[in-house]
Amino acid sequence: SGTTQENAGIILSNQDTQKWKIEKVGAAHDFFIQNAGGDIALKIDQARIVTLPAQPSFQVRKSGNQDNLAANDSAQTITFDTEVFDGNSDFTGNSFTAPVAGKYMLSINTYLASIDIDAAYILVGINTSNRSYYRLVAPKFTGDLNYYGINFSVVADMDASDTAYVFYQQSGGAAQIDLAASNGTHFSGYLLG
């Protein structure tokens, strides 16, 4: 520890076991808080930009279409197979698991193709352990559509170990609607606090 060294800091310990280190590092004067293993919990650079490397955050997308979605008025899980990023490794399979209780910003963007106007409704939603959020469309257009986008964001209250996943539900019409991957079907989220 010290105040004038290039790498100056404070070590917090309990009975001679290092628990946390608060340190100013290098000529850039970046400020770090690290755990005993050296993992950075918080970084503040000289421009006052704060980063939290392990902050729960993710974005996933589809690498291929999910074709001919069922039209039987039951929810079906939208599958995701490509992680763009997963800041704390909390996304597995097709769902995000909250590592801690808090408010989470969750967003879904879907690109639907071959929309059937005979469907009574189409909805895309985010289901969490506490509740469901969704956007509903009653496709009363003059003819079938080549494509249609459904997207929304929500701030969800989640407890530790709660899960969130995306679902699709269609009532009536033909099972002809495809969830296209190439034009931006993705699911993302991050911990607000």
Give names to the regions the model predicted.
Residues 42-193:
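Extracellular jelly-roll beta-sandwich "head" domains, especially the C-terminal globular C1q domain
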Residues 1-40, 56, 62, 66-67, ...:
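Self-maturation zones of extracellular/virion spikes and adhesins
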